[in-house]
Amino acid sequence: MSKLARLEREEIMECQVMWEPDSKKDTQMDRFRAAVGTACGLALGNYDDLYHWSVRSYSDFWAEFWKFSGIVCSRMYDEVVDTSKGIADVPEWFRGSRLNYAENLLRHKENDRVALYVAREGREEIAKVTFEELRQQVALFAAAMRKMGVKKGDRVVGYLPNSAHAVEAMLAAASIGAIWSSTSPDFGVNGVLDRFSQIQPKLIFSVEAVVYNGKEHGHLEKLQRVVKGLPDLQRVVLIPYVLPREKIDISKIPNSMFLDDFLASGTGAQAPQLEFEQLPFSHPLFIMFSSGTTGAPKCMVHSAGGTLIQHLKEHVLHGNMTSSDILLYYTTVGWMMWNWMVSALATGASLVLYDGSPLVPTPNVLWDLVDRIGITILGTGAKWLSVLEEKDMKPMETHNLHTLHTILSTGSPLKAQSYEYVYRCIKSTVLLGSISGGTDIISCFMGQNSSIPVYKGEIQARNLGMAVEAWDEEGKTVWGASGELVCTKPIPCQPTHFWNDENGSKYRKAYFSKYPGVWAHGDYCRINPKTGGIVMLGRSDGTLNPNGVRFGSSEIYNIVEAFDEVEDSLCVPQYNRDGEERVVLFLKMASGHTFQPDLVKHIRDAIRLGLSARHVPSLILETQGIPYTINGKKVEVAVKQVIAGKTVEHRGAFSNPESLDLYRDIPELQDF
């Protein structure tokens, strides 16, 4: 047995439990399992039984969950899905049904309950929007949109911070049947135009400035250039955000008006009433964008019904969310986690919208909000938890956190040491849910589960209805070994199509070119046959394969970033003219530390001991910067292109595009 195989076997056998569900508490997952057993005459003893039934009989599963979730519709479906069609056929779901996404999110009638808590960097005040106020605002937005001619299928976009008005504008667009798309103010002009110019919106909402990391960032000049690049825009609505209206000059922005004037344009003698256009399940709701780090972003069209039922499944069953929960997911409107978070309104839960740095004025800012508001579910990126650990933050000692029952993490693989940190320094009784999926499905393939244990370093389980497997290069299922994450059966949350992809060729190339008829997600993972848990190993397009040994970059990161001397690292392949591959590891040194031969030796030894000799990089070099997307994801593929002498043209998706130039013409890489 190879050293790598022995290591993986040892990891599987270790299976350290970090959290277990309270056997005395009945979860919504338990209730659903019992309901399915009764309705279908099945003996489903545990989650594993339920999961395997849900993918084997996926049509029955989704029908049962439709019933369990209480989705509001004006017409019931004729057929759940044509099971003779595969996932590559993109079958129609819930044919014949009529519904509205916004109606489902606004269905809860406890008018005085808070729907939105709104918090901003540098402001002590926390604003509150009740469900009744939210409905009134959505009605105002929708009436003004209708007045200017927005109709079904039109694109309405937001270039906005994470705010109540972003939620209101999105829900108003959805109530009409318009298609919503959004990006955050930290995107530059090119990044925004790379996205919005492809979908040609009729209406855009934006702000004049934002505050981040203690600084005010003016936004009007960027907005003016964006508007110039969108010739089909009929209206620009400016929402005063940092400054009062009288101090904002929008005269240079054509077809622009302030928000209050826009809302007034749709009102008559009486306040407008909410109207929900009844639409097919497959009607487009969102256009989401790929990262665009290696080319023009793909424009993924997600359906109203597919998004709704998938998000409800994740919130209600996997997250055990109820109307008593308060959810804060630290996100911008440019990340799919914003859409995912907002859908939680359909459970009656309250949302906390935070705009600003999670480290300013102190790294405790989110924990402060947990205690002030009584947040029950906190979501963040894996990187933030690593930063807190590096700063030796111990919220367990400084905060109460008594309401917090779940911490969610996504964006990048959650390291095993982060599990230890959370349970040692944050809260010992919290469910730590690492969740993973992507913008491509606007949801998760796998994630948190309130009915089964949490094991260190593992995502708890594959989610219901998601026929996820790990495949090797020959298309065979592998267990306990690294493989390509695939989905073998249809799911309602896959994009209905790509925008401007009339013959579907881009869609097929994106997901079905590697394994015909099977969705290849582009992630590398390992499924533990003992626990059912999953370890994510990085993007498969950044998979390393020196001398025939395939592994993911995160396997290297997990070892390297345990060194205090290293602030960050990047691991990429380099190819020579003969197609031979070697692995190059770049280290960004932590403050106060220098790049030394002894450190290189220690890192090589640690990788050799922890993985195998064949995992040890051929070169370990210092770098001054590592490129990230605006959503905080490390970008390996673009660096691979740069060191191969190629040009990365689409730099708008990077938070630090200048860092790419650090990898050009590196002397040590020239003679391979």
From Swiss-Prot:
Primary localization class, coarse: cytoplasm
GO biological process terms on file: adipose tissue development; cellular response to cholesterol; cellular response to glucose stimulus; cellular response to testosterone stimulus; fatty acid metabolic process; liver development; positive regulation of insulin secretion; response to ethanol
State if Lipid metabolism is listed as a keyword: yes
Q: What is its EC number?
A: 6.2.1.16
PANTHER family xrefs: ACETOACETYL-COA SYNTHETASE
NCBIfam families for the chain: ac_ac_CoA_syn (TIGR01217), PRK03584.1 (NF002937)
Q: What is this protein called?
A: Acetoacetyl-CoA synthetase
Q: Which organism is it from?
A: Rattus norvegicus (Rat)
Source gene? Aacs
